[in-house]
């Protein structure tokens, strides 16, 4: 109790700190009070297993019918149940890839070609964009079939999100598809109208979070007269079963978070447990990876506190002390820290003790040092930015990006997300590879930093803060803000192309490693859509979270 009073006194006594005045948690005790119903969950599992066997059998039977198999794979993926059929889908796509040329060589079927391209490309097949050449209509147009016009162009648009560097035909297809869909959207009826709207103004199949996209697509799919009853029922049951898992995990995490007493001990910090869980469950979403997911959420919560400490509260001298404590990594450092920092440091050491026990149990103790090194990377980035702010320095674009891609935290979080993975996938070599910043990693952390900065310009201007990437680039290249913004957005698109290219076979490391990187970028599409929804949790994000974690699908 004495420590709490000291902390409050310290915090309230210093009016000169650059406080950000973040809004409080919007969820209250909603998840803390959750009571599971094990009998209900147990009753759903046999039904799910029966439906899985039915779908598995039908997918195999469809191997002699190209379009039937193609549409089944697409539906499984869009409905968010791809993880239930990984081996079956691998076999189906192998079959589709072997038959693609024969099926499409004499056809000008935009829907079939675009859908085939997307599914094969996103699973690593090096299918050439030349398949679209025969569908071109002039320099920038494409031949659109009168039947299924809207869905064919939707698939073309979705396919363009898999493009890599140098694929001019897909760059042009992206522009064409958007213009075409915008021109016909008002004349469409549901469910096609909803699917077109999502393709235009939502998140693409490639860049969208799997759970968010599945939750949107399930009711759309149900409205199609041709929907597969077994797939629809399986997707609904699986979604609702996973929702109970999310509620259970959020309840456990809420107890841990409550014990930290964040509102009292760290009133300057953002209270964003549920939003952090949404973030990390979008990266590590597999039910079997529950322990790794819980650790990742706790680590990101603590990183968020550190971010706010360096960004919106700590004095430069205090930040120096904390940086030294992180680099030393020893409980003896507590004595040197102000009381509010002790809360964060003790919690961090506690979480890493749990990580150490897990790594010993898994026989992967070497990972602990990588996790610690990742924390030192993000804190080191925070401190350099604090030094720039203290000294009123103006970094060049290159200097800014070298530091800001670290302080964004995504390198640290991606490394942390590897901790619970199988030993033969997240090997020592995989950790070293990611830390070396290969092209795909560099693209991801650059994309993450720039996406964050685009929506954070006005927020950062409100208080003493270093310039964002947009402002640094604008100043260095003597551009207007609009011109700098265009260039930054071009760099983001370039990053997505690099990420897409990394998935083409043969890959440097197993695709589960790459999916951790991709999934973080997918979450950013939602978190930083038009604004910083993590800092200011808007009604749109609240609605997404409610759909995922509160309201089951009827």
Swiss-Prot record:
Its cofactor is Mg(2+). A motif (DDXXD motif) lies at residues 307-311. Sesquiterpene synthase involved in germacrene D biosynthesis. Belongs to the terpene synthase family. The lineage of its organism: Eukaryota, Viridiplantae, Streptophyta, Embryophyta, Tracheophyta. Mg(2+) 2 binds at residues 307, 311. GO terms for biological process: diterpenoid biosynthetic process; farnesyl diphosphate metabolic process; sesquiterpene biosynthetic process. Binds 3 Mg(2+) ions per subunit. GO terms for molecular function: germacrene-D synthase activity; magnesium ion binding; sesquiterpene synthase activity. GO terms for cellular component: cytosol. This is Germacrene D synthase 2. CDD domains: Terpene_cyclase_plant_C1. It is found in: Cytoplasm, Cytosol. Its EC number is 4.2.3.75. Mg(2+) 3 binds at residues 452, 460.
């Amino acid at each position: 109790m004495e420590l709490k009073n000291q902390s409050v006194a310290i915090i309230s006594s210093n009016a000169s700190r650059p406080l950000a005045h973040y809004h409080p948690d919007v969820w209250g005790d909603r998840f803390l009070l959750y009571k599971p119903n094990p009998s209900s969950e147990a009753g759903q599992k046999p039904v799910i297993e029966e439906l899985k066997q039915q779908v598995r059998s039908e997918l195999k039977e469809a191997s002699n019918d190209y379009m039937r198999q193609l549409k089944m794979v697409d539906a499984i993926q869009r409905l968010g149940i791809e993880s239930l059929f990984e081996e079956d889908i691998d076999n189906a796509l192998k079959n589709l890839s072997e038959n693609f040329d024969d099926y499409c060589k004499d056809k000008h079927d935009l829907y079939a070609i675009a859908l085939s391209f997307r599914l094969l490309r996103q699973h690593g097949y090096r299918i050439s964009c030349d398949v679209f050449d025969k569908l071109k209509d002039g320099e920038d147009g494409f031949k659109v079939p009168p039947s299924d016009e809207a869905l064919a162009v939707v698939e073309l648009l979705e396919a363009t999100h898999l493009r890599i560097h140098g694929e001019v035909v897909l760059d042009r297809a992206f522009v064409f598809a958007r213009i075409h869909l915008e021109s016909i959207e008002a004349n469409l009826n549901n469910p096609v109208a909803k699917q077109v709207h999502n393709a235009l103004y939502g998140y693409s199949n490639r860049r969208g979070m799997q759970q968010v996209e599945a939750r949107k697509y399930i009711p759309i799919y149900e409205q199609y007269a041709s929907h597969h009853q077994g797939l629809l029922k399986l997707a609904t049951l699986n979604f609702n079963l996973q929702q109970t898992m999310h509620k259970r995990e959020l309840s456990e995490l809420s107890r841990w978070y409550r014990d930290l007493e964040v509102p009292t001990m760290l009133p300057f910090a953002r209270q964003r447990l549920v939003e952090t869980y949404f973030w990390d469950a979008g990266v590590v979403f597999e039910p079997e990876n529950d322990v790794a997911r819980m650790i990742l959420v706790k680590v990101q919560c603590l990183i968020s506190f550190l971010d706010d400490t360096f960004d919106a509260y700590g004095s430069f001298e205090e930040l120096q002390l904390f940086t030294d404590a992180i680099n030393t990594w020893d409980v003896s450092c507590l004595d040197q820290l102000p009381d509010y920092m002790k809360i964060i440091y003790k919690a961090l050491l506690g979480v890493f003790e749990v990580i150490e026990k897990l790594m010993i149990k898994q026989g992967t103790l070497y990972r602990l040092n990588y996790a610690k090194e990742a924390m030192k990377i993000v804190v080191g980035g925070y401190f350099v930015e604090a030094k720039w702010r203290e000294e009123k320095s103006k970094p060049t674009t290159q200097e800014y990006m070298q530091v800001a891609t670290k302080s964004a935290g995504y390198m640290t979080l991606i490394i942390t997300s590897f901790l619970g993975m199988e030993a033969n996938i997240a090997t020592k070599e995989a950790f070293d590879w990611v830390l070396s910043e290969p092209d795909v990693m560099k693209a991801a952390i650059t994309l993450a930093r720039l996406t964050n900065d685009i929506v954070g310009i006005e927020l950062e201007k409100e208080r003493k803060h270093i310039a964002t990437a947009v402002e640094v680039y604008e100043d260095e290249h003597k551009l207007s803000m609009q011109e700098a913004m265009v260039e930054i957005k071009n760099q983001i698109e370039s990053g997505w192309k690099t990420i897409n290219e990394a998935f083409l076979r043969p890959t440097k490391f197993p695709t589960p490693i790459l999916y951790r990187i991709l999934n973080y970028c997918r979450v950013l599409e939602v978190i930083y859509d038009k604004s910083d929804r993590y800092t200011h949790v808007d009604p749109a994000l609240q609605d997404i979270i409610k759909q995922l974690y509160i309201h089951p699908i009827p």
